[in-house]
């Protein structure tokens, strides 16, 4: 899985989640470290995705 596919997978998890998703859970899902997930979330935000970090995990805000 390349970086673009990984970010697409992260978005898929967030879009399907009813509750916040932790960075560790996202890391396990896509097979990378939590730090890579943090970097990917930053890139996704820079691309205009409204992802919010809460104390329970990441949430994709509805448009």
Positions of predicted regions on the chain:
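Key DNA-contact positions within bacterial/archaeal DNA-binding proteins
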Residues: 35
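Extreme N-terminal segment that seeds HTH/winged-HTH DNA-binding domains in transcriptional regulators
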Residues: 1-29
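HTH-adjacent hinge/linker in prokaryotic transcriptional regulators
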Residues: 42-63
């Amino acid at each position: 899985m390349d970086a673009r596919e990984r970010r697409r997978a992260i978005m898929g998890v967030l879009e399907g989640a009813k509750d916040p998703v932790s960075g560790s859970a996202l890391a396990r899902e896509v097979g990378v470290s939590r730090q890579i997930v943090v970097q990917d979330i930053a890139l996704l935000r820079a691309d205009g995705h409204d992802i919010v970090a809460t104390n329970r995990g990441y949430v994709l805000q509805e448009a």
